[in-house]
C-alpha cells in the first residue's frame, strides 16, 4: 500500500480504536472506509481503492497518491505558513484519499458528491483551493470547467482567490500545466479548461457543464439554487465532483442541513449511496462544550492552524458572555444552533440572582 493510502488507513484505524479523539460521525466515516476496503478487496469488485491506472500516454499513476503529492507541491497563501509548502495532515489525507482513491473499473471516480463539515480555522479554503487547481490542470479532463460557487461574489472569490495566489506563487505548476492566471479566471489553453468564481449575484448559473463545483460555507445559503445548479451541472460529465465544505449554521430548514441529514443517515447505514462521501467534525451529544478536550475533539487541525492560545480564550469569553455562546459553538465546535439569537444560560442567571 502506498504511503498516502497507508496514512489514510492508519488514520481511520486510530479513529475507530479511539486513539484519536473524534465525534461519532468521524468514527462512522472511518468505519465505512475500513469496511469498504474489506468489501471491495477483490480485483473483480465494483470499486477498487487507489489502483494503478494508466493515463492517455501510458504512464502509470495511483489516483489518491497523485492528488496528495500534487497538493504538497503547492504553497500556503495565508498566515504564518504563507509561501511554505503544504504538508497534509492525516485527517486531510484520509478525506482526499477516500474521495479520490475509489474508482470504478473504467477508472472513473466512485464518489460524485462530497460533504465535509468542519469548524472554522481548519484550513477549509486551502484544501478546496488546492483540489480546485488539481481538477483544473491535473485530473486528465478535457475542457474541465472548475468553479468556486456561492451566493455572493465575495464568498465565491475566497476559494478562487486562494487558488489564484497558489498558482502565482508556483511557477513550476504554471509551467508544467501551461496555466494562465488572469484577474478573473485561470485557464489551460491546451485542454480548454478554466477555473472561475461564480455567484448568484449577477451570474448566469444555468447551463454550466461542471467538472468540479466547490461550494464553500453552504450553511450560509438561504436557498437551494446554487446547490441544485451544481448538482445538475456535474451530471453532464462522467467523472465530475460536487465538493461541499462548510461549518455548521443555524438554518435547520435550509439546503445545508438537508444535505447534512442525508449524510448522517448514510453514515448510520439507514441506506447506501456509493456516490456520496461525507464526514462531520464536531462534538457528540452530551459533551461539555466548556472543556478543553471538546476543542481538540471538534478541530482536526488542532495545534496546526487551530491554535490553543487563540481558541481557549475565546472559549473562556463565551463561558462568561451568554451572547457569545452561539457564535462560539457554531464557528469553533461545529454545532448547529437553533437560532441566531443570543443563547441564555438560565442556570447561570438563576445562580446570580
Model-assigned labels for residue ranges:
Residues 1-353:
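Phosphate/NTP-binding elements of NTP-utilizing enzymes
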